[in-house]
Each structure stands twice: as C-alpha cells, then as structure tokens.
C-alpha cells in the first residue's frame, strides 16, 4: 500500500486456479472491488486482458492509478514459462515487484522470467515469509515442537525428514498417523493410510531420531463418516470396521502438555475431519492451546489456517504463512525457483 502511494501507476498481476483457456469462472474481475476496499476505496480498474494494446492504451491514457489485469493463467505462456510471453507482458512497464510467495515454488513466467525484462525486486511479503520460515529451519534447540496433521504422509515425508533432527518433539495426528501405526503393527480398521509408505514410516521411527516422534494413543472413531456418530477408543481397541476421524482426549492432553512446555511451535495440518462438528474436537482444542501458548507460533497449510479462522483468532498466532506448497517445499530444504532471485524491496 505504501509503495502504491509513491507510484504514478501500478498494475497488479495475479493468477487464479487452473483454468482451461479463458474460463470466466477464474476471471479476476470479481476481486477488483474487494481490492479497492482494502486500499481505502482507491479505485482499482480491471482490464480484461493480459497484454497487448488494451493494456498499453489504458496505461497511456492514465485512466486509473491502479490496474488489475486478467488472470495470467488464461495464457499458456505463463505456466510454460514462455520468454515471448514474459516479454509481451512486461513491455509497458519499468519495474517489477514479485510478492507472490504462494507461487514461488512454480517455475512460471511471472515467477522467474518477468524480472529479466524489468528493474525487479523481491516484495516485502516474500521477504517476511523467508524470514519466518528460516526461523523454523534455524531453530535447533530445546523447546522446539512440530505438530503435523493432514491425510497423507507422502505430502510431508520430506518435511519430517528435514525437521526431525532439529526438533525436540514431532507430534503426528490426522490421517497420516495411521501409516505410522500400521508400521508398528496396530490394527487401524478402515482408517486411511498409505501402504507404500509403511516401510518408510518404520524406518523413521527406528532411526536415531525416532524417539522424538509422538503418535496418538487414543482416537475418535466411526463406522461411517457420513453418520456423524463418534465413539472414543484406545489405539489398542481398534476394530476392523472403525475409521479414525480425530485424536482422542488422552492424546489431546499429551499434545497439549508438549505444546505448553514449548518455546517454539510449528503447526501444519488438522488432527481430524474438523469440518464435521462431531470429529472436530482435537483440531478445535489444539487450535486453542496454540493460540494461548506463550511459545512463538508459526502456522502453515490451508487446512490449519481454515481451522484458525473457524475456531480462533489469527491475531493470536505469531505467523501464519501464505505459502501452502511453497512453504512446505522450502521447509523440505528445496530451492524454490522464485526465492532470492531478486533484490529485496526496501519500503
């Protein structure tokens, strides 16, 4: 917002979804008014084009101070990282600020090639995200706890491998815990798990860092997710027809004890099917525990953010990442195409 005030004109470029050609359902026109409200009702003019004469004429005629242009992914040159596309899009402009951290893991034209044609900077959001994520990677001391949830170990295996040596405790809930329990020989009924990752889960638990992993000891279960009927059982009491849908009270108590004793918490992923009230207790209570903790709290992942929006207040958390897949890949130790390729913008 401060940089907008200093510019004669600014064009905002963005992408949305995975549209098939110019699918109107993915047009950015619907966000122009909302963007104007966020900018203290300063007029945001929408241009239904990505590049070309329509864009150049609007800028030349100075019809507005702020422009929002159409979805970049309406042109396959964006996803294919076409240099011709990048050259055409950037033609009317002098300066480029890349501030879409959520796309930094994609080798798209707007991420890696627009900057070749303009005086380019890394935006403040990207810089802030990197600062916060580096805190997670650089934290290698007592009192550092990680809480992971969600459905699949395959989505977070590299994350576990990279963070496990650094943490004091790594708690695992959600559907992904059942792959670990399967590896330990437990009956898990009809709960979701990934057969191809059972051996890897066993390897992690048998490693020299395996004693840092904390798994649930009790669960909320159902025989049919659609029934919204929940029973609470110990892990050793799983029956063949049970489906695990939430962590149980004993696990909630142990996870809460660890979190309350922590100095730094990184949370990614819900503890169960929190969208259904009967299965939401674990996620709801964990959200409250972290929000009230004295620890520095960092949260990543869309479902975790949805849980915060549903059960708590975003202001009670020190950092909520906008990155999604970009955050996970960075924390896995991967080099992201859009990170540190431009000099940081100083506002």
State where each predicted segment sits.
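An acidic, phosphate/nucleotide-engaging active-site surface
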Residues: 34, 39, 43-92
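Conserved catalytic alpha/beta core of Sir2/sirtuin-type deacylases, generalized to analogous enzyme cores
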Residues: 78, 82-347
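Divalent metal-coordination and catalytic microenvironments
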Residues: 15, 70, 99
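Single conserved hydrophobic/aromatic residue that forms the stacking wall/gate
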Residues: 1-12
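Glycine-rich loop at the start of a catalytic domain that most often binds anionic cofactors/ligands
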Residues: 17-38
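Divalent-metal (often Zn2+) His-rich catalytic cores of metallo-beta-lactamase-fold enzymes
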Residues: 16-17, 153
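Short, conserved active-site loop motifs that form the nucleotide-linked donor/cofactor pocket
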Residues: 8, 44, 65-66, 211-213, ...
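Short histidine/acidic/glycine/proline-rich micro-motifs that form metal-
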Residues: 17-20, 73-75, 272-273
């Amino acid at each position: 917002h401060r940089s907008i005030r200093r510019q004669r004109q600014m064009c905002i470029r963005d992408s949305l979804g995975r549209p098939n050609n110019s699918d109107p359902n993915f047009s950015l026109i619907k966000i122009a008014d909302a963007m104007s409200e966020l900018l203290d009702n300063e007029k945001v003019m929408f241009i239904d084009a990505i590049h070309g004469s329509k864009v150049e004429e609007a800028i030349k005629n100075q019809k507005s101070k702020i422009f929002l242009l159409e979805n970049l992914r309406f042109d396959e040159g964006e996803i294919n990282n076409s240099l011709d596309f990048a050259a055409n899009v950037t033609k009317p402009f002098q300066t480029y600020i890349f501030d879409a951290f959520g796309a930094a893991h994609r080798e798209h034209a707007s991420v890696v090639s627009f900057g070749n044609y303009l005086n380019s900077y890394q935006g403040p959001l990207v810089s802030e995200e990197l600062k916060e994520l580096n805190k997670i990677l650089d934290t290698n001391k007592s009192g550092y706890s990680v809480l992971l949830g969600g459905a699949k170990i395959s989505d977070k295996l590299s994350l576990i491998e990279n963070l496990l040596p650094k943490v004091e405790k790594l708690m695992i809930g959600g559907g992904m815990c059942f792959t670990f329990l399967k590896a330990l020989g437990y009956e898990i009924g009809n709960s979701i798990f990934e057969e191809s990752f059972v051996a890897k889960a066993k390897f992690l638990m048998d490693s020299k860092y395996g004693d840092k992993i904390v798994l649930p000891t009790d669960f909320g279960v159902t025989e049919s997710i659609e029934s919204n009927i929940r029973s609470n059982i110990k892990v050793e009491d799983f029956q063949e027809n049970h489906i695990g849908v939430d962590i149980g009270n004993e696990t909630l108590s142990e996870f809460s004890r660890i979190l309350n004793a922590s100095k730094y918490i990184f949370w990614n992923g819900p503890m169960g099917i929190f969208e259904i009230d009967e299965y939401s207790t674990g996620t709801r209570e964990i959200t409250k525990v972290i929000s009230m903790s004295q620890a520095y709290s960092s949260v990543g992942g869309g479902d975790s953010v949805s849980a915060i929006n549903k059960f708590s207040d975003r202001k009670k958390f020190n950092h909520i990442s906008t990155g999604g897949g970009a955050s996970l890949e960075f924390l896995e130790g991967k080099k992201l195409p859009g990170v540190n390729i431009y000099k940081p913008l100083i506002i």
